[in-house]
Amino acid sequence: MIIVTGGAGFIGSNIVKALNDKGITDILVVDNLKDGTKFVNLVDLNIADYMDKEDFLIQIMAGEEFGEIEAIFHEGACSSTTEWDGKYMMDNNYQYSKELLHYCLEREIPFLYASSAATYGGRTSDFIESREYEQPLNVYGYSKFLFDEYVRQILPEANSQIVGFRYFNVYGPREGHKGSMASVAFHLNTQLNNGESPKLFEGSDGFKRDFVYVGDVADVNLWFWENGVSGIFNLGTGRAESFQPVADATLAYHKKGSIEYIPFPDKLKGRYQAFTQADLTNLRKAGYDKPFKTVAEGVTEYMAWLNRDA
């Protein structure tokens, strides 16, 4: 069996899909479906069982067995960069991850987990997986950073695989439940379909992000599991592009509309990453050599998925 925590969420459900595509269906999805809309991410997928996150954590802490586990993909976390309840964030992202890590280490189960580019904070260069480059801007980024630091202490002595992925700006299918935290491509598509002008913040051409397609993210997760490589790795494309190419690809797909530029919100000033670009040196050294989709390729594929029933 393979366990995917956060399996009804954005990246988790795409990992389930990637496993299904390889003929793997003996999957336990762990999630919190208090937001019931997330069920749609699993409707077209095949899994063996579902468990609530709280029930799962109780069983993990009690040391209960789940049968033979081939791997745990730990994608379950609070991923909101605007959540400032530090106790909630540390319980959900840090403590939960530690419990699961030690459960895996005791049983030599491969443990693949979600870190984040938010660990780098407001950098504008040198997004490198090393302590001197890490200074998160929000409590979400801090929770991810602290767990990475914890993993670094354990890695030299670990007898089983531990790998963390610092996801950059991931977009693609199955993110609709994320609301305001969904990608710009998702929001632009929704605005166009609602007959509205698609909107970007003023100065968006000055914000550059490493936009990585979720299908590529799932492929990297599976490659590392299959190859048993440990460590903490950036997971982006290595390219930084402004929001304009995202908008251009969206408009090109819809063959209509023009961008309306709106004022940048005060609440995000000083807490907004203006630039992200993954340094892929360590990822490539580890042996992952596949290309990543460009924004034009990824957004076009995503638009086709979003509008498949139109």
Swiss-Prot record:
Its cofactor is NADP(+). Pfam families: Epimerase (PF01370). Catalyzes the interconversion between ADP-D-glycero-beta-D-manno-heptose and ADP-L-glycero-beta-D-manno-heptose via an epimerization at carbon 6 of the heptose. Substrate binds at N169, S180, H187, F201, E202, G203, S204, R209, Y272. One of its GO terms (biological process) is lipopolysaccharide core region biosynthetic process. The active site is at Y140 (proton acceptor), K178 (proton acceptor). This is ADP-L-glycero-D-manno-heptose-6-epimerase. NADP(+) binds at residues 10-11, 31-32, 38, 53, 75-79, 92, 144, 170, 178. Keywords: Carbohydrate metabolism, Isomerase, NADP. One of its GO terms (molecular function) is NADP binding. Binds 1 NADP(+) per subunit. SUPFAM superfamilies: NAD(P)-binding Rossmann-fold domains. Belongs to the NAD(P)-dependent epimerase/dehydratase family. HldD subfamily. InterPro entries: Epimerase_deHydtase, Heptose_epim, NAD(P)-bd_dom_sf. CDD domains: ADP_GME_SDR_e (cd05248). Contains a large N-terminal NADP-binding domain, and a smaller C-terminal substrate-binding domain. Pathway: Nucleotide-sugar biosynthesis; ADP-L-glycero-beta-D-manno-heptose biosynthesis; ADP-L-glycero-beta-D-manno-heptose from D-glycero-beta-D-manno-heptose 7-phosphate: step 4/4; Bacterial outer membrane biogenesis; LPS core biosynthesis. Its EC number is 5.1.3.20. It catalyses: ADP-D-glycero-beta-D-manno-heptose = ADP-L-glycero-beta-D-manno-heptose. It comes from the Bacteria. Homopentamer.
